[in-house]
Amino acid sequence: MTELVSGRDVLRQARELYAHYRPAVQPTGMKVAVIRFTPAATDPPDWRVRLEASRISAEQKIKSFEHLGFRADHVVLPPGVGRGEFREVLEGYNADPATRAIIVQFPPPRDLAPVVDGMDPAKDIDALLKGRSPYPACATAEGIYRVAEPFATDRPSIAVVGSKGFVGQGVVTMLRADGHDPMTLDHGDRLERVRDADIVISVTGSPGILTPDHIQPHHRVVIDSGFVPQADGSVRGDVRAEAYGIPQNLTPVPGGIGPVEMATLMERVVRQEVDPDVVSWKVTPGPYLERARFTTDRTAAATAVTTAAVPSIAAAARLRGAAGPAAGAPPTSAQPTPAPRGPAHQTGPRPQLPPQGGGGPSH
């Protein structure tokens, strides 16, 4: 059976790890600004859906930063906002010394995108400024990379679907920096090629683009970063629900990469403003079989029975239970570990840190 890689467990761990910074942060008045856009009633439905996802994400960011003791400004710009008004808001936060980080929720309206380039690079905590940000990729991309990393210690084949998008580019950048050579796929490519990968990462935002025809039992982990709100209040990811029982491990939607993004932003702002040696959250992989052993063991199991075939999902489940993981660890859990540091952005003395323990309120 498929093991779910819980992003909510990662976020819970991050909140516990970083709660003890709150008493040091809160008196400083340090602030994070989150700016988002509102659709007009006449906008196309797909645009309204994207901005609804942006709203949900912005609200979760506000909660995460406030949990750490930062003040959080949630700036909601009205439909049809002009470049001048948007630029004025952005420049105000650039000039405000109390504002330590700025996030502009993506996507901005096309005619406003150039204004984002005016953000102070030192406050670009989500890597919106290509080539000028202190970070190599956005928090979502880093979170995806860190979820995939413990499944990829032996340099397996990794497919990234949606590799040309904002998040996808970041994922590919981080994988290549770590020595991987990912298979990059986008709309119009032959998506069935993902069958040949050991790890599948999908960041298209196209509901159900990956079906049971694409997802395979030998896939160590399928990481689904899609998040598309539906009219009935549900949320759909890139992977169809019918494929959820096929891979060995999977990040669910909702409750997968979204919370991981929040944990990454919390870690970044603490490292940037409070403690450069902050302990990092970590994902420990669920059990999985390497493809060579998976194939060999499945063939042996099929030979041992007299019926025509052993169903693939049931066979994979029995094999994992009987043989145990050839790589990986017990089911998903979160353990602290050091991670690459972000920038040392600090214009004044760091707040004095209390002994670790305790924490702020839970949102």
Tell where the protein language model's regions lie, with residue ranges.
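Rossmann-like adenosine-cofactor binding region
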Residues: 187-275, 281
